[in-house]
A protein has these predicted regions:
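Mature, structured domains of secreted/extracytosolic soluble proteins
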Residues: 26-711
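Bacterial Sec-dependent N-terminal signal peptides
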Residues: 1-45
Length: 711
């Protein structure tokens, strides 16, 4: 039995083999590429470049970096090589001539790595895929990518900056003492890919491209090829397929583009703007960067700490983790122009940078007069003042700032910037945005409006705080800057100086004295404390001069009633010192210094008497005339003996030497004391007996008093 069972098992296995053989044979796939390569598949990347005979410089980079075998083997690379002619132009732009490969060999190892890696992506991308991004939530986002990270690393761009090239602020003094500083880039630089797919998705037009490329030649808007930074890849030189990746052959060397900070600092025509921008540069210590650099270059190669040059900005550096700098008090940029990855794959920034000539023209013009009067020189403008100016020249998003949108583009406060294509002298492509050098300045609305001079002068600090209080949540914030920043109206803004604001005749107590003989007159002396206006209240001497101090109003944070009193008085003052200049329906509306109106109507409904023209204009309120006080005059500046009168975009500003005040005497008491008005006064007063006799008469039951006194 045992032998018989073994025979049956052998027979069964033989049958399995016989039956299974045809099945195994049927699994044979006749796929033709098992034994041969596709005809469209080229050589490996290295062989392709070598066989062409036009890429000796690029291959010198490859060989010097030991990358030959990598580019011969299978892998997944996308490369943007340039031929030897392009490298000759590249070296010539740097003042170098000679044999291309020799010039490559003479470069430092880090320079070679930085240049080579900037032309390589560690994935395979056909040209139409360069604008795609992947999203965990939405899958593939097609056509929305503008930039990509390359194989290049900030570790190959460490620089030692000598004292002369360091920012001039105190933040960098310690490095001047050390004879310089080691600085790392703020992130690894990305490369821009201007593809037809991105053009279509973003709406970037041919006219837009002409502005972006202003100053360049032979850079046409291309819907078939594409650009890498500003290097052109023509349609017949893209998507070269090799065994281990794709080549897109550029007309120029694909080198790491500078960031916006580097563009501005290296362009001679932008020196003035660059100097202001550098006031916000800060040596930021990042331990992980310092460790990475020293590990990369080896122990002892760099003994000092390595810092990152960053800029105070509202996007990612508005507070100091070490609490050494009050950044918001110091002032910030809108975003960091040195941040190489700002905007990510799909967006970046824009900066409109006025040329030195444009900055000088603005400074010397009537629009910049108030800054010149306050500070004398661009470099003397405080950082918290100039930061607002610089922010207005930054745009957070390239996509929302395409040239075809400039006619509707608004600044950070929502006002039209009024940038025109003809304003642009030249455009620069940076790794993190576009820098447009312009022949115009675009000041913020605060520096265009009539209250602009008030904000910067050291003699109008009280009125400055009254007009624009940065604490928008303060219930007593009058917010008059929102009214005065309207560019659709024209204003006269009369601004009492700080000295004038120290002598305000309180209208309530002075009215009691003028009308009823109750002498409890007070003089209020306004000043700024902790950013808010407060007042010292003084008794009044018999001759109307300031007497003893009675109390201080609004200084205590718990003194809410006092704060309300101060706000009430300030509102009266502001209403009295604003005259609308272009109200066609008001005969007493116009510019006070043109000599056409002897009287003008204020915003609050008071009437001012006006005399003189231009800088010699004089103004008087009814209360001033009533008290026999002289007219208010435009003050003379100490610096250049010039009158403090300013032409602004929405009107004229006058610094005056006294507060204008309404009459203290009421109409009733004025008319009752003047015999010339007696008959009319008696008519107005009427006869109470008439109303008493008619009160019970049914024939006159519909007669009601015009004025009623509430109980």
């Amino acid at each position: 039995m045992h032998a018989e069972r073994n025979v049956k098992q052998v027979v069964r296995w033989c049958l399995y083999i016989v039956l299974g053989f045809p099945l195994l044979n049927s699994c044979k796939d006749d796929y033709i590429y098992d034994n041969e390569e596709p005809s469209w598949l080229g050589a490996n990347i290295y062989e392709y470049l070598e066989s062409s005979g036009q890429f000796d410089c690029y291959l010198a980079l490859v060989n010097d970096l030991g990358y030959k075998e990598t580019l011969r083997l299978t892998g997944s690379k996308t490369m943007f090589p340039a031929n030897d002619e392009a490298f000759s132009r590249y070296f010539l732009s740097k003042g170098l001539t000679g044999d291309g490969p020799t010039l490559i060999h003479n470069m430092s190892a880090s320079e070679k790595r930085y240049l080579f890696n900037s032309s390589m992506l560690n994935m395979t991308y056909l040209s139409h895929m360069l604008a795609n991004v992947s999203s965990n939530d939405q899958g593939i986002g097609e056509g929305i990518a503008l930039r990509r990270a390359t194989s290049a690393s900030y570790l190959d761009s460490i620089s030692f900056v000598k004292p002369a090239a360091l920012p001039k602020t105190a933040f960098w003094n310690r490095f001047r003492e050390r004879k310089g500083a080691y600085l790392a880039d703020n992130g690894s630089k990305m490369v821009l890919y201007w593809t037809p797919e991105f053009f279509s998705t973003s709406g970037l037009t041919e006219a837009d491209w002409a502005v972006i490329m202003k100053g360049e030649t032979d850079k046409p808007y291309d819907t078939q090829g594409f650009y890498v930074n500003d290097a052109h890849v023509e349609s017949n030189r893209k998507d070269v397929t090799c065994k281990n990746g794709y080549l897109h052959i550029a007309d120029d060397v694909v080198a790491p583009a500078p960031n916006m900070s580097e563009v501005i600092n290296s362009t001679a025509e932008m020196n003035t703007f660059a100097g202001l921008m550098e006031k916000f540069a800060y040596p930021y210590y990042d331990g992980s960067v310092d460790d990475a650099v020293k590990a990369y270059y080896g122990a002892g190669s760099i003994e000092d700490s390595v810092f990152v040059k960053r800029y105070f900005n509202q996007t990612d550096f508005s507070s100091d983790p070490d609490e050494k700098v009050d950044i918001m008090g110091y002032g910030t940029l809108a975003f960091d122009p040195s941040n190489n990855v700002y905007g990510g794959n799909t967006d970046m920034g824009v900066m409109f940078v006025p040329s030195d000539a444009a900055m000088e023209d603005y400074w010397e013009s009537s629009r910049g007069q108030f800054l010149r009067d306050s500070y004398g020189d661009w470099d003397e403008v405080p950082t918290n003042v100039i930061s607002v100016f610089l922010q207005n020249h930054q745009r957070l998003s390239f996509l929302t700032s395409l040239p075809h949108n400039w006619d509707i583009m608004t600044d950070n406060a929502g006002f039209e910037m009024s940038v025109k294509e003809e304003d642009v002298q030249k455009a620069y492509i940076a790794c993190n945005g576009i820098v447009y050098m312009t022949d115009k300045v675009y000041p913020p609305v605060d520096y265009q409006a009539v209250y602009g001079p008030v904000l910067t002068a050291d003699t109008t600090t009280t009125m400055s705080a009254a007009i624009k209080n940065d604490d928008m949540d303060d219930v007593n914030n009058l917010k008059y800057h929102l009214y005065l920043r309207s560019m659709d109206n024209q204003y006269n803004l009369l601004v009492p100086t700080d000295d004038a604001m120290a002598n305000y005749r309180d209208p309530i107590t002075w009215a009691l004295w003028a009308n009823e003989g109750v002498d409890k007159r007070e003089i209020w002396s306004f000043y700024v404390k902790m950013g808010k206006v407060v007042a010292d209240v003084y008794d009044t001497n018999e001759d109307g001069s300031k007497g003893a101090l009675l109390r201080t109003v609004g200084a205590d944070a718990l003194d809410t009633e006092g704060a309300e009193e101060v706000a009430n008085r300030l509102q009266d003052i502001l209403e009295m010192h604003i005259v609308v200049a272009d109200n066609e329906d008001e005969p007493l509306s116009g510019f006070i210094d043109e000599g056409t109106l002897p009287y003008v109507l204020t915003k609050g409904g008071s009437v001012l008497a006006v005399s003189g023209t231009g800088e010699q204009v004089k103004v008087q309120g009814g209360g001033d005339r009533e008290m026999g006080l002289p007219e208010a005059e435009v003050v003379t500046l100490e610096k250049d003996n010039r009158k403090a009168r300013y032409e602004m975009d929405n009107g004229r500003t006058f610094f005056i030497d006294r507060i204008l005040q309404d009459p203290f005497k009421s109409v009733y008491y004025t008319m009752s004391a003047n015999e010339d008005y007696r008959a009319f006064f008696d008519l107005l007063v009427g006869n109470d007996d008439v109303f008493l006799s008619l009160a019970d008469n049914e024939d006159y039951k519909d007669i009601e008093p015009i004025f009623e006194t509430s109980e």
